[in-house]
């Protein structure tokens, strides 16, 4: 049986850093990964760019995490966003600040983050083994003594770190193994729920908006027709629904509301800088300005091209209809695309 001081299960970002830090303290460390290489999911996160951290203060971080955010105060007091940036700077990866307080590697390549973490672990003499799935713990007197791999090999250690991640992306190795392993040790597992995920909608017109990106817009999540939360930023339409930074942020909230059998809608404000009166005044000005020209021409000043056709169909506006023929009732509908 092979024996080390520390065994880390899972070679994602957390596992690589935990293994490297433990090794820096003089410990012999074995890092075990079931996939063919470390940090597969990290290499594709942020559309391949890797959103490393955010510039928000600690209170906003805690708030965004949800109901159990206070659990993170202790960890964040020891290692927070500035520490993260400094950590990667020391590893040779410079980061840049973008809209929304998001930090990305200057290269816009998540592989730079992955390679830096692997190098960090290896430079500190961490032994990494891949294609090795942990299937069981061996315990004596309520203490873990060793782990058993799927191939039958066993490894013992004084300390064990479970860093398997969640179950968000099975192809990358995130299949929920950690829940099963923790449960086998007697831990109670709270039912996981989706977070940071796209949303699926049955609205047929969304298919016409596939790949449309909207920036500097505001979305409102409506709970039983009442605003539950508002966010400013960007979204993207897909063939199945919605995605993008704002959608990923509110997805956990929406799932919780749906679990409570609430009625949930998303409202998108394309002109958040204008209140209803200002927007109404602008629409009237545009209609008057375009006069005998087709409504479609006027709409190009207000809406992305891809939205115009679905909008006209929804509001029964004919292609031949001219601006001067739009009555007040139809004009008011322009406020709620």
Feature roles, as predicted:
Residues 1-14:
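Beta1/beta-strand and adjacent pyrophosphate-binding region of the FAD-binding site
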Residues 49-97:
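Glycine-rich active-site loop/strand segments that organize a redox cofactor
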Residues 130-143:
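A conserved short coil-to-beta-strand element within the FAD-binding core of flavoproteins
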Residues 155, 159-205:
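Glycine-rich loop(s) and the adjacent beta-strand/alpha-helix scaffold that form part
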């Amino acid at each position: 049986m092979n024996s080390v001081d520390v065994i880390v299960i899972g070679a994602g970002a957390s596992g690589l850093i935990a293994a490297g830090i433990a090794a820096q303290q003089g410990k012999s460390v074995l890092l075990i990964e079931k996939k063919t290489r470390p940090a597969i999911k990290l290499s594709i996160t942020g559309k391949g760019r890797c959103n490393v951290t955010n510039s928000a203060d600690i209170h906003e971080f805690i708030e965004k995490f949800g109901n159990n955010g206070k659990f993170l105060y202790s960890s964040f007091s020891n290692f927070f966003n500035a520490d993260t940036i400094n950590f990667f700077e020391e590893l040779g990866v410079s980061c840049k600040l973008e809209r929304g307080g998001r930090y990305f590697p200057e290269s816009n390549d998540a592989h730079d983050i992955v390679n830096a973490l692997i190098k960090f672990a290896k430079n500190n003499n961490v032994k990494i083994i891949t294609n090795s799935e942990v299937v069981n713990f061996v315990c004596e007197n309520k203490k873990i003594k060793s782990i058993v791999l799927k191939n039958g090999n066993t490894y013992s250690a004084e300390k064990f770190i479970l860093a398997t991640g969640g179950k968000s992306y099975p192809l990358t190795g995130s299949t929920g193994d950690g829940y099963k392993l923790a449960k086998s040790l007697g831990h109670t597992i709270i039912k996981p729920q989706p977070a940071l995920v796209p949303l699926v909608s049955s609205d047929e017109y969304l298919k016409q908006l596939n790949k449309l990106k909207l920036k500097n817009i505001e979305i409102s999540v409506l709970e039983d027709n009442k605003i539950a939360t508002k966010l400013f930023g960007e979204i993207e339409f897909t063939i199945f629904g919605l995605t993008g930074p704002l959608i990923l942020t509110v997805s956990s909230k929406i799932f919780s509301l749906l679990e409570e059998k609430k009625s949930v809608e998303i409202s998108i404000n394309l002109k958040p800088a204008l209140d209803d009166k200002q927007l109404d005044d602008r629409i009237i000005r545009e209609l008057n300005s375009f006069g005998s020209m087709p409504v479609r021409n006027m709409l190009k000043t207000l809406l992305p091209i891809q939205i115009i056709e679905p909008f006209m169909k929804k509001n029964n506006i004919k292609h031949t209809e001219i601006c001067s023929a739009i009555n007040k009732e139809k004009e008011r509908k322009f406020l709620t695309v």
